[in-house]
Amino acid sequence: MDRYFFILTTIDLFVLGFMCFLTRLSESLNKKQKRGFFLAFALIAAISVLEVITIVVDGTPPGCRWLNILSNYLGFGLTPAVALCLVYVLDKKTIIRRGFKAAVCCEGGYLLFLAATLPYGPVFSVSAENLYARGGYFFIYVIMYYASMLYLMAATVRTAAAFQNRSHPLIYPLILFLGAETVIQIAFPALHVTWLCVTLLSVLYYIYCSEMWNQLDALTGLLNQNSYLNRTAEMRRSGGVLVVFDVDDFKQINDRYGHLQGDVCLAEIADCIKKAYARCGYCYRIGGDEFCVLLKDEASEARCAATLQSLLAERRKTLTILPTVSLGSAAFSGEDVVAVKDRADRALYCAKKEQKARAAAAKPADSEEKD
């Protein structure tokens, strides 16, 4: 076996082993994410070893033919599953989405197809002399491989967009890099660099996802305070709008119904803010019950605010304790964000006073109706 390939595989396995331990010891990943990354790294390591086995046993006495067939079958069959493991980590929720279930079924069907057609060798064959050869329908493997990569790319871009991650275009060059490498591998079969590249991609993907999740608030899924501070630290622009939100009488919700119900209310409010404003700006949770949005322009402000109030009213039909939300805004006009934030806060306080006045005026009317 080529010593160069053996050295690459050794480096590959070391990196994957390190990533497995890093995943296991991580305190920022939940159990589902740890499981997905661990399976992906372990699967890449296993397929890398299988590739070594196929090279070692190919052309040896026919007694090793079964090992050659098994190693190639598992290598070709399990390759698309790597992308599925990485898709699995994207959603922190324990619920398995329908699209992912369909992808798993496709992978299962592909494995069954490979097993059923082993005697005929459409994808690959191992002769009686124990010599490997690509089959006439080798493109089936290539299609499954590229389909899994495209599925990973689409799922990642969709998730990153939902999390308002500005670096989501970076996933495209990662997939293109792997796709180009695969073309080279197909054209030059003796050049065994596929799984080294897949290892590199998986490590970069781990870094990418960690960076994406580190920008999020764990409870609400909005961008967190640190993201807000970094984004606005030296921000000076014109044409945009800073909108700040505060939950009215939120302390009473916590005192009366408990902090768990308070968290439910915050999550619902955050979801409404994202649905109302995400297409027009970036949404942040900057404090306990404080949120803000950096709008791209003033034109969408009134429409987004109306949409938010409509969404909150709709949610209040099922979650009756959902409190009202006051907001204030200020346009950017070239000054630093601190000055803009101060003006937005003053507008917010005026809105809260008006909200309290309306609530106080409504109470006597309610009492008269009851009498």
Q: What positions do the PLM features span?
A:
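Signal-transducing coiled-coil linker helices
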Residues: A154-V157, A161-L219, N226-G240
